[in-house]
Amino acid sequence: MIKKTPFFNKFLGFSILLFILVFSVRAQETPEQTDQTVLPRKFRQLSLGMNLDDLKEALIKDDYFHFRGDRDVSLLPIREQSLVETTGSSFIKRAFFQLRDGSVFIMAFTLNTEIIDHYSVFNQFSDKYGEPAYLDPKISVWETDETRISIERPLTIKYIDKTVFNDIINESGLIESGQVQRRQEFINEF
């Protein structure tokens, strides 16, 4: 039988207090862990889903970019798509914004590797959003149902609206399947 001494009572009391403290801290950490699954759809004042006029205004106001207005906007021959390409200052070398039906669905920022290294950016993302869903030496990807963020080597960060992007992929598959069918019909005529 264990003899209960004042030391034993202090040890038992300390153990119980430590146990309660550890579990109360863990309970407080739980919301932060669930927040890691929410990926940002925004960098500074630039966000997925914003319209072209708001994008141009935000780029003009942001000191990280050297936006030259409409000279940096190109219309793409693809359905209602346009591309905004601009240079950056210091940390950002170049930035690309692809719009469909007037809304941004891809933002890509090529960072200056003389100032910022891949490892630091990767660690920041991992600390904030957890481990990537996909990882290889060339790309790290974090994903939710709505958003995909990738860090690509040497150092480009891409934000993609997955809903719009998947619609484009599905449409291109339909176009391609129609072309395949017409091709086969043509070949069958011989």
Task: Locate each region found by the language model.
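Short linear motifs in intrinsically disordered
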Residues: 2, 86, 129-133
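Residue-level detector of functional hotspots within protein domains
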Residues: 11, 29-38, 49, 81-83, ...
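Bacterial N-terminal signal peptides
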Residues: 13-22
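Mid-chain, structured segments of secreted extracytoplasmic proteins
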Residues: 73-116
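Bacterial N-terminal signal peptides that target proteins for export
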Residues: 2-13
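Non-cytosolic coordination micro-motifs
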Residues: 28-72, 108-190
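Sec/Tat signal peptide C-region and signal peptidase I cleavage site
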Residues: 23-27
